[in-house]
Amino acid sequence: MNVCKLKEIVPLFPRSSFTDGVVSTGKSFRSWDTCMDNKACKIIAIVGIVLACILVIWLIGGLLTCFRQGVTGIGQFICWCCRCSNDRNGNNTMPVNEGFSRVNMGVAPPSTVIYQPIQQPESAYYRNDAKNDTFYDEVKTPSNEVYELEEDFDLEKQKEKTRKKQQKERNKEGRSPSRVAPLVYEEENFEGSSPQPQYDARNSFIQNAANTGSNNAHVASQSPIFDISDYGENYYYDNNNINNNLQGNSYNTPSSNHRSPYPTENYQSYQGYKPNQSDRYY
């Protein structure tokens, strides 16, 4: 008997339907038309196309992220699932106070800087006292009129007003009754003495001090008349016994009736100038 004929009649490995389906499906991949005719080949083709599209989109996004963020962008784009999980865990956790941890670690925390926006100065309301120089005056006046000041605050203007006020106060003090020039009483004319013209008090004092060598000689000069603006307010003046003070020996003898050219307290007497001593006594 021929062996080939036996194989055809009794096959060694009988084929099943599953095996025939796999073989036919593999043969259908040879062309698009035959693949679309086979059901299994069509499903496999559609799934493969979808996966290929997802892979292409993933790679294109990673390339664009690399151009924008550098090489690390590729890893972040490929591991998007890991990144999403990390972000989700980060949102669930409590925020960490880095400044507190730095203090515990022994590192000084940075100084806190608070930035505030620059605002324009607001206009203020001042009372109108009907004066030209009322830019920053905040005083009560009889007028009840209130007007809005449109100008902004100016430090130079405030300084100028302060100087003007100080100047006005000094002028008022200069014209006060306490600083008015004193009245000078007419001195009595004694026998043998003639009135002498008035002269400067300072020059008279220097001249009398220079003539200390001739103490026995009479000083033929009138007692000086001092100006209160030069010696202050508290000066002592007495018109009694003026003739005794005109003598030369009055410089060596203390006299309680001598007019003091310097300010004194409680109107104490002036002892005069002593040629033997270099200090003055009040």
From Swiss-Prot:
The modification Phosphothreonine is found at T141. Residues 153-183, 246-282 are annotated as: Disordered. It is a single-pass membrane protein. Glycans are attached at N91, N132, N276. Residues 253-282 have a biased composition (Polar residues). The keyword Cell inner membrane does not apply. InterPro entries: PSI_induc_2 (IPR037504). The keyword Membrane applies. Keywords: Amyloid, Glycoprotein, Membrane, Phosphoprotein, Prion, Transmembrane, Transmembrane helix. Signal peptide: none annotated. GO terms for cellular component: cellular bud neck; fungal-type vacuole membrane; plasma membrane. It is found in: Membrane. The chain crosses the membrane at residues 43-63. Present with 996 molecules/cell in log phase SD medium. Not known. Seems to be able to provoque the non-Mendelian trait [PIN(+)] which is required for the de novo appearance of the [PSI(+)] prion. This is [PSI+] induction protein 2. It comes from Saccharomyces cerevisiae (strain ATCC 204508 / S288c) (Baker's yeast).
